[in-house]
């Protein structure tokens, strides 16, 4: 079985730092007007002070129940918000980051604002020749707060133009933030946008907005409905547990239907509402779905996938050849879980195909097994596909973010379809347009024996696209299966098994990206094969960031999961490397891992790529191609500049 002996030249393996998150932040309440009445009774010289608290809320606000409690940290909060500054009390000493290192961390082809904080993707859509992307944005700092809707447009989902801010918190019903929302195309092609507002009393309500000028392909100006809010927390739902409306879909009765995430005690739930005009709503007594002990469901998504085709489906499509996906972002764990199941339109309910891997269950399915949260899909009618966006937060300290002046990126948009071979999971793949950034390429065919580390000569290794196939030598597989001393291992975990330094008979093997020449810094992305039940192979796909940087004030987890490998399939992976972000896709996208890494030595020209096989017994053949990647064209829009490069 596995040995902890490592042949890779590495530094001592440290336990990954645990991510910490403050569950509560202080709430600053708006001061209410106070009238002070002073009555002086003549002859007695007694002064009585009467203080009357007068609340001047309008009628619609008075209908909203509020709770006097601390504001809960929601999707928008940075997960590792501690600042490590000394080792005297057991905390990790902060690394002396400098501008040279921090400048290198900024990505070249992932979307991010010019500066400051960004989180959830909002309301993505394709309209009059442009892809629109809205996002949670703080225009004032590199930390969460003052949330508005940023806005950018693209012709191809890769090259972007920043547009003016789309919506700001300028009304009582969104005074504390214009939070996450979704777009819906109506039957006549017009657009409505539902979004969550955090009121001046920190109550979460749903609001309606629409384009001021539908003829404008850039959708520069948005109008908020005069009757907002259109939905308030219903009885039994906490004032701060009611957020993130989905894209609406058409029911068989012709009404529009949306779902909104919430919780009741520790049960995560998805509320259902019907509407005909997006201004008035009918709440269903039943829930679309609920799962006990999963906590608050944020950024719920609900959409159909085809059982037979590899194209995407409009959100309203239903029928016998369709399955439906529910995704919820778990506030407690910061993980995006999904499940596949059957939707009953008449009852407005959904049931999972496999209850043992229901939404939010720890052994259930995830979009991504790394740093990926608050995701949102949309149907791209331009190319007949469903596109997934996901927020990739930082794993460094907030102090480092402030120093570099920005925080967070978005993942490369992915297509999403049902795996028509397994019928049990989704497959995600970077949109085809990313290939337009490929520059020079090199092809390699290598056979690497046990304990081998091989440098891969590709020149600069900061911006790469790698596609690879691996095969384990047949004789080694036969010996492995025939060895009765090797027991089945169905509980192998990338996170707890020692990472890429833990040696087994058939792994780990893969690539070390963002490595320095001496491998003191490296981020291995790899497969590990174990014996499963009934003489089958179990394959796990992992990313080990525990040695990605010499800095200690960084969270450095080991990510991974089992990945289905069907009979006759080779082991395949694709890796996108873009400075401080690594995105890995195994078996055509059945398993995905996104990581944030912060090298201090493996930067600029010192960044290297290695192929490794740290197995004890197996010889592995690797066939792969490595492309250098160009920069994406991402800059502010001007009326004189419409020449955006396009791959379409």
Curated annotation (Swiss-Prot):
Question: Which Pfam families does this chain map to?
Answer: Glyco_hydro_32C, Glyco_hydro_32N, INV_N
Species: Arabidopsis thaliana (Mouse-ear cress)
Ribosomal protein as UniProt keyword: no
Q: Which UniProt keyword terms apply here?
A: Abscisic acid signaling pathway, Disulfide bond, Glycoprotein, Glycosidase, Hydrolase, Membrane, Signal-anchor, Transmembrane, Transmembrane helix, Vacuole, Zymogen
Topology relative to the membrane: Single-pass type II membrane protein
Pathway of action? Glycan biosynthesis; sucrose metabolism
Q: What is the lineage of its organism?
A: Eukaryota, Viridiplantae, Streptophyta, Embryophyta, Tracheophyta
Q: What is this protein called?
A: Acid beta-fructofuranosidase 3, vacuolar
Q: Which residues lie on this side of the membrane: Lumenal?
A: 57-648
> What PROSITE patterns does the record tag this protein with?
GLYCOSYL_HYDROL_F32
Residues crossing the lipid bilayer are 36-56
User: Catalytic activity annotated for this protein?
Assistant: Hydrolysis of terminal non-reducing beta-D-fructofuranoside residues in beta-D-fructofuranosides
Q: Which family does it belong to?
A: Belongs to the glycosyl hydrolase 32 family.
Major subcellular location class: membrane
Binding partners and assembly: May be present in two forms, a 70 kDa monomer and a heterodimer of the 30 kDa and 38 kDa subunits. The ratio of the levels of the two forms within cells appears to be regulated developmentally.
What Gene Ontology terms for biological process does this UniProt record contain? abscisic acid-activated signaling pathway; cellular response to gibberellin stimulus; response to abscisic acid; response to bacterium; response to salt stress; response to water deprivation; sucrose metabolic process
Q: Which GO terms describe its cellular component?
A: membrane; plant-type vacuole; vacuolar lumen
Q: Per its database record, what is this protein's job?
A: Possible role in the continued mobilization of sucrose to sink organs.
């Amino acid at each position: 079985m596995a040995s902890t002996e490592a042949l890779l030249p590495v530094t001592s393996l440290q336990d990954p730092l645990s991510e910490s998150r403050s569950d509560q932040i202080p709430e600053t309440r708006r001061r209410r007007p106070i009238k002070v009445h002073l009555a002086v009774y003549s002859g007695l010289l007694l002064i009585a002070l009467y203080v009357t608290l007068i609340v001047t809320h309008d009628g619609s606000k008075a209908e909203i129940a509020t709770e006097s409690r601390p504001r809960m940290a929601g999707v928008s909060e940075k997960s590792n918000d501690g600042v490590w500054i000394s080792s005297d009390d057991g905390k990790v000493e902060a690394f002396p980051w400098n501008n040279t290192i921090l400048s290198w961390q900024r990505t070249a082809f992932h979307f991010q604002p010019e500066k400051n904080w960004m989180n959830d993707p909002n309301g993505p859509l394709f309209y009059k020749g442009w892809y629109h992307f809205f996002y949670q944005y703080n225009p004032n700092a590199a930390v969460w707060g003052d949330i508005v809707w940023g806005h950018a447009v693209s012709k191809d989902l890769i090259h972007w133009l920043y547009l003016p801010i789309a919506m700001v918190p300028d009304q009582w019903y969104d005074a504390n933030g214009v939070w996450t929302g979704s777009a819906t195309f109506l039957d006549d092609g017009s657009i409505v946008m539902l979004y969550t507002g955090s009121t001046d009393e920190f109550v979460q309500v749903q609001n309606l907005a629409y384009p001021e000028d539908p003829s404008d392909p850039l959708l520069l100006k948005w109008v908020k409905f005069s009757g907002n809010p259109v939905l308030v927390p219903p009885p039994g739902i906490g004032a701060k547990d009611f957020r993130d409306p989905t894209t609406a879909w058409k029911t068989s009765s012709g009404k529009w239907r949306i779902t909104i995430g919430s919780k009741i005690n520790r049960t995560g739930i998805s509320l259902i509402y019907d509407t005909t005009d997006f201004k008035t709503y009918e709440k269903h007594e039943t829930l679309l779905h609920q799962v006990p002990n999963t906590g608050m469901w944020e950024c719920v998504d609900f959409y159909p996938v085809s059982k037979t085709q590899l194209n995407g489906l409009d959100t309203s499509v239903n029928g016998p050849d369709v399955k439906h996906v529910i995704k919820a972002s778990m506030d407690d764990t910061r993980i995006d879980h999904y499940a596949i199941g059957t939707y009953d339109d008449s009852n407005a309910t959904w049931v999972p195909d496999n209850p043992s891997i229901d939404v939010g269950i720890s052994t259930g399915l995830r979009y991504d097994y790394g740093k990926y949260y608050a995701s949102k899909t949309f149907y791209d009618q331009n190319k007949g596909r469903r596109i997934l966006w996901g927020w990739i937060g930082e794993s460094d300290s907030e102090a480092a973010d402030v120093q570099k002046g920005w925080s967070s990126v978005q993942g490369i948009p992915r297509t999403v379809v049902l795996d028509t071979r397994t019928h049990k999971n989704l497959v995600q793949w970077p949109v085809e347009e990313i290939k337009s950034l490929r520059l020079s390429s090199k092809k390699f065919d290598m056979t690497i024996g046990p304990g081998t580390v091989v440098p891969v000569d590709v020149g600069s290794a900061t911006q790469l696209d790698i596609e690879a196939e691996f095969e384990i030598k047949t004789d080694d597989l036969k010996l492995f299966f025939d060895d009765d001393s090797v027991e089945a291992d169905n509980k192998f975990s990338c996170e707890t098994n020692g990472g890429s330094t833990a040696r087994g008979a058939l792994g780990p093997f893969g690539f070390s990206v963002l490595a320095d020449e001496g491998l003191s810094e490296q981020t291995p992305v790899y497969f590990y094969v174990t014996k499963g039940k009934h003489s089958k192979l179990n394959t796990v796909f992992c990313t080990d960031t525990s040695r990605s940087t010499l800095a200690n004030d960084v969270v450095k987890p080991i990510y991974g999961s089992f990945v289905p490998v069907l009979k006759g399939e080779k082991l395949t992976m694709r890796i996108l490397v873009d400075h401080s972000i690594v995105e890995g896709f195994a078996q055509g996208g059945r398993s995905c891992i996104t990581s944030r890494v912060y090298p201090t030595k493996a930067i600029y020209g010192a960044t290297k790529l290695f192929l490794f096989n740290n197995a004890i017994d197996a010889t592995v053949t690797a066939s792969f191609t490595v492309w250098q990647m160009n920069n994406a064209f991402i800059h502010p829009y001007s009326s004189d500049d419409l020449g955006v490069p396009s791959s379409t």
